[in-house]
Amino acid sequence: MEVEQTSVRSDTNSTCEYLDAEGDPESPNLYQEADPDQEAEQQNHSIISELRDGLGTMRDNSALSPEPGQENKGLAASVESLALSTSTSAKTEDSIGGGLEEEYDYQHDSLWQGQKKHIFILSEAGKPIFSLHGNEDKLATLFGVIQALVSFVQMGQDAITSIHAGGIKFAFMQRSSLILVAASRSNMSVQQLQLQLGDVYNQILSILTYSHMTKIFERRKNFDLRRLLSGSERLFYNLLANDSSSAKVSNNIFTFLTNSIRVFPLPTTIRSQITSAIQSNCSKIKNLVFAVLIANNKLIALVRMKKYSIHPADLRLIFNLVECSESFKSSENWSPICLPKFDMNGYLHAHVSYLADDCQACLLLLSVDRDAFFTLAEAKAKITEKLRKSHCLEAINEELQQPFNAKLYQQVVGIPELRHFLYKPKSTAQLLCPMLRHPYKSLTELERLEAIYCDLLHRIHNSSRPLKLIYEMKEREVVLAWATGTYELYAIFEPVVDKATVIKYVDKLIKWIEKEYDVYFIRNHATF
């Protein structure tokens, strides 16, 4: 059993690689923690309030101390209890019928033992908020153990970050009256699990805002936050269904692991026409902060107000919202959304709609003006009309039907032994990731590929001993990780390829990416 503690720190999910990055700044470690003073300042300052003031718009805005010498015994007992509980205590939603749930004994559910990952969210008072598997109320004992563990460590003016026990990694994150825990049997490192917890925390803030949630817990520490999150459970389940533990074959795991987003591949001329259409119809709308056009969980175009940028973590929340909301396809919607990395204390008001019935690209116009719906609806109609006349809708549809990513292997001519790769420029937070193909299209093989990338990313971004180059000949593949001053490349080759051939192929791949760069990446984002 191994327990890791650390002094109280800030968000491990922070990065300075923003989506409008220009040039090639020195890139921080992927898991680098935020400056506590900077985060505290952000919590007390609202960018949205500042924008509204500038634009002239209106806004409404104890644990008992143990006996001497008993702390370590109590902590060890709690750790043992937590490891035991997460091996035998809960069930999946599908394992028992809803009618029997009230009488079911979670403490003896062997079906849950096969789960590879759990996420638990509770308040500092120990009140259950969310469990990825099982009913929170039926897991009260487990939540109590978690709260006891955190309290033991807090009494020493410290914070617990991870526990390794019973073949399970437990990653902890404490944020603004909340305790978030990931329990995993996968190959993910503690830092990678904390990245995922950071996304979950941001999802909560996107619904409630930091200031509102803080006021609630200041008034009532044992408040049941599920009352305010009711109806949004689908957002959490979908957000967490991004790796093989969800029994889905998907590329989403790679954007989460690299703290990035993917760009919708388009010819440069088409993307420029799309951006121009948004600019020309939105430039005079003073209250508009961001215009985001997405399709298939990828960014087509982003236009922003000068001085303001959007973080990849915030964009992933937008992608998640659109993916989970079928109603957006049938009508125009007006939704408040908090983008925590932009401003954790206030809402932007989003006009959300698909461009047309015959084009499944979704446009979000985010404003600080809560009364701008009709103005933005008119702008959206004009944008759609202009894109139809310039045949941009046809270009988007063609890519949706015959994805560039599916043709990546054919386009990279002469590298038949290349199985898969990830490429991330350090000047952006964007990722090039081809579609999965044989042998990684099955869930079992995806788990293996996921484990390989988790290991490579952890070693490249290890805070104590980061590596620049990794080359390994494994039994079933040859793997390469290479971090230069301008990009990161992770590549998987057939096991028969030797080192000289890998070097030749990597050189060829990099040259091809540089040639096609503007199809798969957005260098700079336009402004209003």
Swiss-Prot record:
It comes from the Eukaryota. Disruption phenotype: Accumulation of autophagosomes and reduced number of autolysosomes in fat cells caused by disruption of Rab7 recruitment to autophagosomes leading to a defect in autophagosome-autolysosome fusion. Impaired lysosomal degradation of endocytosed Notch and Boss receptors in the developing eye. It is found in: Cytoplasm, Cytosol. Residues 1-16 have a biased composition (Polar residues). InterPro entries: FUZ/MON1/HPS1_longin_1, FUZ/MON1/HPS1_longin_2, FUZ/MON1/HPS1_longin_3, Mon1. One of its GO terms (biological process) is endosome to lysosome transport via multivesicular body sorting pathway. The Rab7 guanyl-nucleotide exchange factor (GEF) activity of the Mon1-Ccz1 complex is autoinhibited by the N-terminal disordered region of Mon1. GEF activity is stimulated by Rab5-mediated recruitment to membranes. One of its GO terms (cellular component) is Mon1-Ccz1 complex. Keywords: Cytoplasm, Guanine-nucleotide releasing factor, Lipid-binding, Transport. Residues 1-50 are annotated as: Disordered. The keyword Transcription regulation does not apply. One of its GO terms (molecular function) is lipid binding. Component of the Mon1-Ccz1 guanyl-nucleotide exchange factor complex made up of Mon1, Ccz1 and Bulli; the interaction of Bulli with the Mon1-Ccz1 heterodimer is mediated via the C-terminal Mic1 domain of Bulli. Mon1 and Ccz1 form a stable complex which displays Rab7 GEF activity with or without Bulli; GEF activity is enhanced by Bulli possibly by improving membrane association of the complex. Interacts with Rab5 and Rab7; preferentially binds GTP-bound Rab5 and GDP-bound Rab7. Belongs to the MON1/SAND family. The disordered N-terminal is involved in autoinhibition of the Mon1-Ccz1 complex guanyl-nucleotide exchange factor activity. Part of the Mon1-Ccz1 guanyl-nucleotide exchange factor complex specific for Rab7 that promotes the exchange of GDP to GTP, converting Rab7 from an inactive GDP-bound form into an active GTP-bound form. Plays an important role in membrane trafficking through the secretory apparatus. Required for recruitment of Rab7 to endosomal and autophagosomal membranes to mediate endolysosomal and autolysosomal vesicle maturation. Required for fusion of multivesicular bodies and lysosomes but not their formation or trafficking. PANTHER family: SAND PROTEIN-RELATED, VACUOLAR FUSION PROTEIN MON1 HOMOLOG. This is Vacuolar fusion protein MON1 homolog. It comes from Drosophila melanogaster (Fruit fly).
